[in-house]
């Protein structure tokens, strides 16, 4: 039976045919083995931290199994959310309800009936008991989406729950670190810590090579290497690009991945991503007040202010998700075409614009928080955003 490309390359679901196990550097210990060990340690909470789009949730699904994993998101919680009501609802337990009791009295000719309604709330002990009896593992994904106050409330609930042997995994990003978990004195000695590294190019190449082999599509090692560089350490992005390649090859009735198809596939892939507003917001910067912004002529003839230069610097080759300030500043200088007697912008000016841009993005919805300026480095928190920046803009 011929297998379809969408069954092989699955960007948003468990990749049965293209799952790649990864190992701690210089060891034969896989992430799967480490997670199994953590889950078998009674009374401990598992904390998984790693960059966005790195397969943290897929790792959990691989080890736990789709039938046993119960996923909730930090975004599910606000200050009015009942934690245990949410946990119960995910497994369809009736957390609150009413019980009607009826009483009958009968005489020779008449039967009387009366009754009363009683409200109940399921105890957390019963919820924990259900999870344990049914071998369920609670995975709180995107823990950083919850407010710091809510994170602390959840941490307090989990402290007692893990003592009762509820299995819980908390998943978060490294630069929005779950301090409520990892820095919580009440959880000291009760944590299994797992830090997920970014993907190496050799592991990303395996996704392409395995998948295309399954589909009987030819691809050279050199092409797979180019794909691995462009997918910016993200296995999810690799799945997206490979699926786009398959769609284009099928349309052209071809069975080989060539250099010519790559750029077309990159641009085709960005149709899936909605970052246009994010890019526009970054390029415009904060609302302008007072004097006009200084404009710089670029080597390709554009006129950009510092916010525009920041955006273009992110898009330059080679694609990087972590950029030191010196490298970032160098990229900006390379973009500017200086006229006579004109000087390059001071480093302090660039840093000030990065700080203001950071404040602007932090005040907006989560999708806008694609980059972070912290500790002298620019971090790209979302590889899909950077990929869009490089290939999705009409004038990019």
What are these regions (language model features)?
Residues 1-46:
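A short, basic N-terminal segment
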Residues 39-61, 76:
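Walker A/P-loop nucleotide-binding motif
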Residues 49-50, 70-80, 173:
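A short hydrophobic beta-strand->loop->alpha-helix junction that borders the nucleotide-binding pocket
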Residues 68-69, 78-109:
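Conserved NTP-binding/hydrolysis module of P-loop NTPases
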Residues 94-140, 144-167, 173-186, 197-203, ...:
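Mid-core helix/loop region of P-loop NTP-binding domains shared across ATPases and GTPases
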Residues 196-224, 233-241:
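Conserved small helical "lid"/interfacial subdomain of P-loop NTPases
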Residues 221-279, 396:
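Amphipathic alpha-helical "lid/sensor" segments that cap RecA-like P-loop NTPase cores
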Residues 260-396:
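C-terminal leucine-rich, beta-strand-based interaction scaffolds used for sensing/assembly
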